[in-house]
Every structure is written in structure tokens, then in C-alpha cells.
């Protein structure tokens, strides 16, 4: 039986100085119960906590670590960059190279580097409003675009985990121009544009939602969004903060090929450091300050540490890396289904490229209502049983599982061997 005494001690200390003891709500384990392990190191596919317990990590820092923890190329790039200076407050060649890397892989013509996915989506929407002269934004229930006020309405990720409709502190005025529609419902989109098409600046959607669990777009959904927005003079923003450079070298765009007006990126492009970007057509991006009048800025945007880690990650994420991750995800998802089926546990595993979510329901999940209808208590029991056996899953039912190039056969064997006991634990929950 693993011990967690040090983590308990650290969690108690943290709660005296940090709200809830964590700096991002889902880390507090409120959705699954228990005390979160406090991590001290990561190497390859493994995490080690303060009590010396090791875990196969299927979170990968919520997506960024596509090469695994402490990949030598990333560590070397960071050490070299840090030795030269951590921040200059001035342009660098590395940020040009990272922008070139993003442009070469996606349909965007220019990008602006920022520090978080929230900044990226917030800035993209400001640009869309400035470019169109319109105010309203269409988003979809269960899609998560960061914690900017106007986009927290019916959001996924932590907002879904804690069953919040939005958040206290988000005023009616700040969300008044946000139109929330059910996901995967083109008829609802057409109706919104029929009613207020000349007021809608943009539609923003996760290219493949993975923050209410993985709920892929129905065939042709993103393409239809592209057609509707173009017809009405609105812009389409596809959010690839999570899927970008993870599900393929070109993200979800590489799998589907729908080119929006603007895109947002994050996670993998920072290699585990705070970094994100938004980009799009040159005529739109040139409306940003200092070329245009739409203001956007950031003290640490494009900082040398994040750009070094991002470049090292993208340059080492070879086609072989993606093939390996695809195979790892396929093996584990099949094993999960086999274990749950053996115990008679209703479930549905939904994929978005090499991302997947195990929904504890027997029906296809196509929208936020379907995701919320699952048996989250069963997920909590499954999670705790996996954690006790040294497998670190997302501590919430509304998230994706992540794999890396470092998840070798030994790590995957450990995951698979833990599944029967976890399935039994889930089966005991009504």
C-alpha cells in the first residue's frame, strides 16, 4: 500500500497560503476524492511524488509533454537558453523560428506569441471584433477556451468538473455578447445567424473538443461552420490549444483540413513552459498593433526559455513519435474497453486522433448534455484504483488521456495490468 504522508503534509501547508491548496482547481482532486500527490520529479513516462511513489503519467502536464518528461533535447535547449538570459524584453531570433515553425505546419500566415491559451483566445476574439466591427461571439456549450470572462459560459474543463454554469464574478455585461449553442448542432448555428448574423463577429470552437471529454465534431461540422461564417461575413476561430501539434504534426487541421480565419495554439508548442499563440490570415493579423489599431501586448510573450523548449519539442516530434503515440493510445483504449466489458460496466470510449476519453455511459456523447449525463462516481472509483496501482489519470471525468513518445512497453504494460482491478472498482458503484 502506497504511503502519501508527505503529500498530505504539503497539501495542508498549501491550503494555508494558496486557495484550495492548488493553482488550478482540477488539481485539488475534488471530483475524484482524496489528497493530490505532490510531485517532485518527472522522467520519461513517469512521475515521482514527495513520498517516493512513482506513477505512469497519462496526463503529460495536460498535453504539452509529447516527448515525455525531461526529454534530453528539451532539457539541453532550456539549459543553453537560461545560461544566455531568461528574458530580454526585446525581439529574438528564437521567436521568429518558432513562428516560422507554426506557419509551416498550419494554414496561418502570421502568428503572435503569447503566454497562455486564455491569452490566445482572448486576443483572437478581440482581433475578430476589431476586424469585423461586430460584437457578438458564438461559442459552444462544453467547449473550453480559457478563463476569460466572456467565454466561461457553459464551458468545459474545470468549469464542467465543478458543475458551474459559468463563474461568480462574470458579470452579465461581460457575457452579454456571447451566444452559447449546443455543440454539433448546425441547425442551431444557422438559426443564430438568421437572428443576429450581422452582429456576429466570430464563431469560436475547439477544433476537436477535449475539455468535456473527447467529443469529436460530426463529419462536416467544422466545414459547415466555415461555410456559414463566410456567408455572413463573420470569422471562424478554431481553438487548437489542446489538439495543436499533438494529434498530428499539424494538429487537428492535419487530420481534417478545414482552414479557419484564425487559430489558437498552446501546450505542445511550449514544451512544458508557458507559451501559446494565435494566428491567421495576414490581412487580419496585420490589424494588430503596432501595424494596426487592435491592441495586444505581453511582457514575457516570446520569452527565450519558452521558445527554446517549444522549438526543441516541435523539432523532435517526428512522424515516428506520432505513430508511436497513436499506437499507445490504441492499445490502452482497447484494453480499457476489454476490462470494463468483462465487469459489465457501461462505457463508451471516444477518440479524437490519439486523444481519448472513457465515458461511463452506454450512449454516444455528441454534446455537453451527453457528457454531463455520464456516471462520474464510477469514474472516481476507477481513477482511485488506478492511482493506487501507480497510474496517474486525469482527476476529472471530463478530460482526455495523454500519451508521449516516452511511453514504452514497460509503462504501457503497467497501465494495462492495473485495469482489471480498476474495472472491478467501477463495477461496484451504482
Swiss-Prot record:
Gene Ontology biological process terms, A to Z: protoporphyrinogen IX biosynthetic process
One Pfam family here: Aminotran_3
PROSITE patterns xrefs: AA_TRANSFER_CLASS_3 (PS00600)
EC number, UniProt record: 5.4.3.8
Catalytic activity: (S)-4-amino-5-oxopentanoate = 5-aminolevulinate
Cofactor(s) this protein requires: pyridoxal 5'-phosphate
Compartments where found: Cytoplasm
Listed InterPro entries: 4pyrrol_synth_GluAld_NH2Trfase, Aminotrans_3, Aminotrans_3_PPA_site, PyrdxlP-dep_Trfase, PyrdxlP-dep_Trfase_major, PyrdxlP-dep_Trfase_small
Record-level Gene Ontology MF annotations: glutamate-1-semialdehyde 2,1-aminomutase activity; pyridoxal phosphate binding; transaminase activity
Gene Ontology cellular component terms for the protein in this record: cytoplasm
Sites bearing N6-(pyridoxal phosphate)lysine, chain numbering: 267
Keywords: Cytoplasm, Isomerase, Porphyrin biosynthesis, Pyridoxal phosphate
Pathway(s) where this gene product acts: Porphyrin-containing compound metabolism; protoporphyrin-IX biosynthesis; 5-aminolevulinate from L-glutamyl-tRNA(Glu): step 2/2
Subunit structure: Homodimer.
Family recorded in the similarity comment: Belongs to the class-III pyridoxal-phosphate-dependent aminotransferase family. HemL subfamily.
Name under which the protein is recorded: Glutamate-1-semialdehyde 2,1-aminomutase
Amino acid at each position: 500500500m502506497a504511503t502519501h504522508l508527505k503529500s498530505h503534509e504539503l497539501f495542508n501547508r498549501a491550503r494555508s497560503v494558496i486557495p484550495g491548496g492548488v493553482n488550478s482547481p482540477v488539481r485539488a482532486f475534488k471530483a475524484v476524492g482524496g489528497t493530490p500527490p505532490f510531485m517532485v520529479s518527472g522522467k520519461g513516462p513517469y512521475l515521482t511524488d514527495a513520498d517516493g511513489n512513482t506513477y505512469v503519467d497519462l496526463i503529460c502536464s495536460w498535453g504539452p509533454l509529447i516527448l515525455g518528461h525531461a526529454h534530453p533535447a528539451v532539457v539541453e535547449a532550456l539549459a543553453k537558453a537560461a545560461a544566455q538570459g531568461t528574458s530580454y524584453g526585446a525581439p529574438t531570433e528564437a521567436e521568429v523560428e518558432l513562428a516560422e515553425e507554426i506557419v509551416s505546419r498550419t494554414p496561418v500566415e502570421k502568428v503572435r506569441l503569447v503566454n497562455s491559451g486564455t491569452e490566445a483566445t482572448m486576443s483572437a476574439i478581440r482581433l475578430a471584433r476589431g476586424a469585423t466591427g461586430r460584437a457578438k461571439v458564438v461559442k459552444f456549450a462544453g467547449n473550453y477556451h480559457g478563463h476569460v470572462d466572456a467565454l466561461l459560459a457553459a464551458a468545459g474543463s474545470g468549469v464542467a468538473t465543478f458543475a458551474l454554469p459559468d463563474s461568480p464574478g462574470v458579470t452579465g455585461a461581460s457575457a452579454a455578447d456571447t451566444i452559447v449553442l449546443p455543440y454539433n448542432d448546425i441547425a442551431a448555428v444557422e438559426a443564430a445567424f438568421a437572428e443576429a448574423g450581422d452582429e456576429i463577429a466570430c464563431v469560436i470552437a475547439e477544433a476537436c473538443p477535449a475539455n468535456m471529454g473527447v467529443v469529436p465534431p460530426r463529419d462536416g461540422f467544422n466545414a459547415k461552420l466555415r461555410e456559414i461564417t463566410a456567408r455572413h461575413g463573420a470569422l471562424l476561430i478554431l481553438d487548437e490549444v489542446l489538439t495543436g501539434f499533438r494529434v498530428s504534426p499539424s494538429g487537428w487541421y492535419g487530420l481534417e483540413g478545414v482552414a479557419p480565419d484564425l487559430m489558437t495554439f498552446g501546450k505542445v508548442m511550449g514544451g512544458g513552459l508557458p507559451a501559446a499563440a494565435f494566428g491567421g490570415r495576414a490581412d487580419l493579423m496585420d490589424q494588430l498593433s503596432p501595424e494596426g489599431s487592435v491592441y495586444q501586448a505581453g511582457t514575457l510573450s516570446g520569452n527565450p526559455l519558452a521558445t527554446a523548449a517549444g522549438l526543441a519539442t516541435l523539432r523532435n516530434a517526428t512522424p515516428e513519435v506520432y505513430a508511436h503515440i497513436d499506437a499507445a493510445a490504441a492499445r490502452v483504449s482497447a484494453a480499457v474497453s476489454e476490462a470494463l466489458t468483462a465487469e459489465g460496466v457501461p462505457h463508451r470510449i471516444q477518440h479524437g486522433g490519439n486523444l481519448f476519453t472513457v465515458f461511463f455511459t452506454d450512449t454516444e456523447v455528441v454534446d455537453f448534455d451527453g457528457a454531463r449525463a455520464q456516471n462520474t462516481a464510477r469514474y472516481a472509483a476507477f481513477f482511485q484504483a488506478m492511482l493506487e496501482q501507480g497510474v496517474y489519470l486525469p482527476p476529472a471525468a471530463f478530460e482526455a488521456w495523454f500519451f508521449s513518445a516516452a511511453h514504452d512497453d514497460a509503462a504501457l504494460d503497467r497501465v494495462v495490468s492495473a485495469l482489471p482491478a480498476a474495472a472491478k472498482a467501477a463495477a461496484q458503484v451504482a
